[in-house]
Amino acid sequence: DVYKRQGIYFLQKVAGAFHSIGKVSTQYVRANSFYDKNMASDTAALSMEHSKRYLLQFALQKDPIEAKRYVTACFGKSMYSDRQQDEMEKKLCVGNHKNCHLLFTRGISSEKKQTIPDEIDNKRERREILAFKKETAMQYDKNKEHFEKNMAVYQNSIRRLTESLRMHLETADETFMDASTHGRIKPARVWKALYLDNPRVFERKDEVETPGFSVDILMDASSSRKQMQQKIAAQAYVLSKSLTNCGIPVQIYSYCSIRGYTVMHIFKEYDDYGVEDELFHFVAAGNNRDGLALRAASHLMELSPKPKKLLFMFSDASPQDDQIAGEGAFYKDREYTDALAVKDTENEVQRLKNHGIDVIGIFMGSAHDSELATKIFGRSLVKIKSINEFADAVGRVLNEILT
């Protein structure tokens, strides 16, 4: 039951990272997890079976307009006009990412989650899109159920991280004495009440919390994160809630790459409040072109209302995409994977740092990939082994950067 069509694609294992094991000429591959005796016990390989209801969509060499229709039907319409989209791609989709595309979306509205646009007339594609939407809805329930089941742990993490951030912010607060209608009486001002009918004869100490920075959260939403979806959504919730509690502007989005498009799903913008539940819509699919996602994040951070910017990136340090690197003799006919992709991601992290943006990696993965994470993020890396470590580890790195 494997659908076939001509094209060049990667067949991959789902583990802590993607590992290429060959090329096949298929359009659609449904992936059924099974355990491989030759792999570590905590990793899963893939069989090419039609029975499982989630999809690994490999890139297809076809009309980019059709690809856009497909990706939009899966993830939601673009936030930008066609003209704005073209301008951004001319700016961002260059070098290693030439011939790639971007989709910035806020997702699909609830009333359209189980519908498919009429312009998708291919019956096979319609079935695949509908199956993906059903999986997305199921994953929302799983994410929320996981958070509620571990509510005590996550609420405790929010409390600890909020307290840690507030302690740091207090050292940067501006304190001044202001005239007020209540507070401690100031004898020198009493005459104003008697002769000028001015009741502001008291003195009150105002502490103005002025966090001069914003935080963006970028989440890897590729298929290699399927086993971590609930934890990623919950950790992003904890981080977002803690920052918001301290009056720090937060923007949150995920990324994955399908059919030549890197999809940036915007869950929360800087001026959105009380929308953390949107994070439970986090779902993993496709590949991850980390370098292009970082460029897209840089674009989104231009809207920050603060002079200093921080970017948290939830990553497994294993960038991979079936769209080849676009330019340069060294990269010609080379897939975006392994050393090439890691180096590209490292370069993009460094580019952001050179522009004054602090990039912090949040990593949960294998020891091998931990070395790659260190290579990409340097000292600004949070390695998480359990849920209970998250708040303290993130708080520690934040305080180091902001001190």
Regions found by a protein language model. Give the residues of each.
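Acidic, glycine-rich A-domain
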Residues: 133-403
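Extended non-core architectural segments that shape protein topology and connectivity
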Residues: 1-164, 168, 178-179, 380-383, ...
